[in-house]
């Protein structure tokens, strides 16, 4: 048991008979019930699978993760796969036909078409009652999806641990696929794929095997890439496509290395062993030679931008980030364009250490004032570029120009790079108010919070931006936006630019260089953005087994055809959802999906990243529910809700979410509850879906969808994030993570210590890992203590809540003062006390650093310190409007709680009960 820091709390001592109904802060999600061993205690069900044997589980997909216990005599961790040494399904001894690399009635390594495997028991269905799961066990949010249970001979190399894709890259909302469309519709569960081709910002941070010999074998009919699930036929000379069943020839180079003159073992090839792999593409995969990295910096130089410090901060950050721009082969090119009521170009002469300012005032027909010297090689012109970035703010320091011609500037930038493609990275502190694409302030007072809010405030106010974005996409040009205005900026309209060009909208409301924290956030995010290893001229296509097809696509890209998604540049911090439909009855026990991204790397190499997924099928509704992935389903419903919010109305989006939950509960009650007892609870659901109602309820209260009045720029920015975030960040954005700090274990905030035994010496060795975080607690005030200290992470910001009745010693340990009301509040940073002065301060700063540490997002999370209310609070404190607003903002993260205008999770379940019972 971990130690707890003991702060004096005599004024809060509670006798046994006065113990509160709410559990102590820091308790597990089950509030006193051991998280794994007794997780099913409140469900009134047997956590053991009973007579049904457990199936062998692909490594990496979790095992028995919803509380099933190991059998007597087994000592494996319940969240891990049990030992599989020479065992078959359910722990049985393997027969010769199950042993890897055997020839039992089929060719060596025959794959999916080898000896038929017996029918597998799929994941067991466990039922839980949502009304008895309060507070909800949020530890489920960190669990992997239900296991993918497929026959051992599905993969061509049965011993490969990576034959099925990790859910980090490729996952399905259903880990058992209905065998016909009627069953899918009856289930009311969505069938969609979540694709995330890249999981880190930089290539060197991930380890994806690559086939570098440019030998690529594809199906002649469906163009599927050879993969771990194909079948070898004719003694290994041909392979049968696992998607369309066509036979294809095995390339001779799979068996013989012509360059070295030595034989090869085809079973060693990475594409037959790994589900996520890259191919180095030959010339036939190139419409033209790979293009260099190209950045055109479009910088607002109007009075708003200059006075707020945006112009100087941006140019200084670019200067400091030049070495971070991916430029391995020294071909990266850059251009700079200042924008107010004129277009300010900067022309460079080769070999000179300066640049020439060229001003164009014709906004109707933007033209390039020089045929050369505007777009230049970064490496060859480094001194001149550095000098320009140092001098750039001085060109505009005394400006009184309040106009901002964004539309003409974008068209000019497009002209510069239309023949090679690239990125238009745009920094704006003003509303575009002159030239093509001119926008005006909308009437928020009349429409915010009203039924027509979507049409009047969230739709595009000018068709120029979408049409221009589509034009950019066809020219391989991406637009990224960094918006910092203190006033209305029409994010809803401008965000069409990144949405259809595979870019992103970054929003910094009321940004000012006077606030060091604002400067830090913008600078860090620009720098991370510039250093990201983007993929250029990319397309993404998802293929599936015969009888299925893709029917809808969600994310930031342009859908070029029925199944081809176009990305001028492929960002590494977003994910995408593809909805699937079942067109024919599926007769095979396993279906397959393959996602392939063709792209050019930032170092000039054409590559194809291929991801493969094999999923079992079933005709039983209970199999489908038992293997549904609640996080992927929540991701799908988020995209659908955003789509409805923009196309129809916010109330329609919220109603859609609630109706979806009701439909799922109705199906479960009518078809899967044992005996369908009339008096049974209407809130029963499979255990693996018990967090889905909480997530979707939280989504209805999110800034992007809630019914209250919300500034339209903030709402539009939130909708953009909801429709592009990868699942781990999306879940935190919907349901924030809350940590209790005042009673965390002594090991929290310090490097995790792992003790291992050296096999040679027999001595214990201790290694240090990452910073250990406290266990999250539920998003409700009921899990808080009025003298506590809490950290709230909502994926965008971090709030440090200091309760109004906090113990003075705790304040002193963290802030170096025992005067609660003297500590800085709002956007700030913690004081850096030395470990010998305050270990607690050191540990909390470590925790904050760990939360901010992200290898897959550019987001820098600002810290907001909030002092909670108290009956002893000085009157001058309670009258501070900024502090009151800050409290409301932080408390809005406690989504399980009831507010003045919105119901809490308990009330929501009560309302669901009435809807389902009808």
Swiss-Prot record:
InterPro entries: ADF-H/Gelsolin-like_dom_sf, Gelsolin-like_dom, Gelsolin-like_dom_sf, Sec23/24_helical_dom, Sec23/24_helical_dom_sf, Sec23/24_trunk_dom, Sec23_24_beta_S, SEC23_SEC24_subfamily. Residues 219-244 are annotated as: Zinc finger-like. Residues 47-84, 92-105 have a biased composition (Low complexity). Keywords: Cytoplasm, Cytoplasmic vesicle, Endoplasmic reticulum, ER-Golgi transport, Golgi apparatus, Membrane, Metal-binding, Protein transport, Transport, Zinc. One of its GO terms (biological process) is COPII-coated vesicle cargo loading. Zn(2+) binds at residues 219, 222, 241, 244. It comes from the Eukaryota. Residues 1-28, 41-112 are annotated as: Disordered. Disulfide bonds: none annotated. Its main location: cytoplasm. The keyword Cytoplasm applies. GO terms for molecular function: SNARE binding; zinc ion binding. It is found in: Cytoplasm; Cytoplasmic vesicle, COPII-coated vesicle membrane; Endoplasmic reticulum membrane; Golgi apparatus membrane. The keyword Nucleotidyltransferase does not apply. It is a peripheral membrane protein. GO terms for cellular component: cis-Golgi network; COPII vesicle coat; endoplasmic reticulum exit site; endoplasmic reticulum membrane; equatorial cell cortex; Golgi membrane. Pfam families: Gelsolin (PF00626), Sec23_BS (PF08033), Sec23_helical (PF04815), Sec23_trunk (PF04811), zf-Sec23_Sec24 (PF04810). Belongs to the SEC23/SEC24 family. SEC24 subfamily. Component of the coat protein complex II (COPII) which promotes the formation of transport vesicles from the endoplasmic reticulum (ER). The coat has two main functions, the physical deformation of the endoplasmic reticulum membrane into vesicles and the selection of cargo molecules. The COPII coat is composed of at least 5 proteins: the SEC23/24 complex, the SEC13/31 complex, and the protein SAR1. Golgi apparatus membrane; Peripheral membrane protein; Cytoplasmic side. This is Protein transport protein SEC24. It comes from Meyerozyma guilliermondii (strain ATCC 6260 / CBS 566 / DSM 6381 / JCM 1539 / NBRC 10279 / NRRL Y-324).
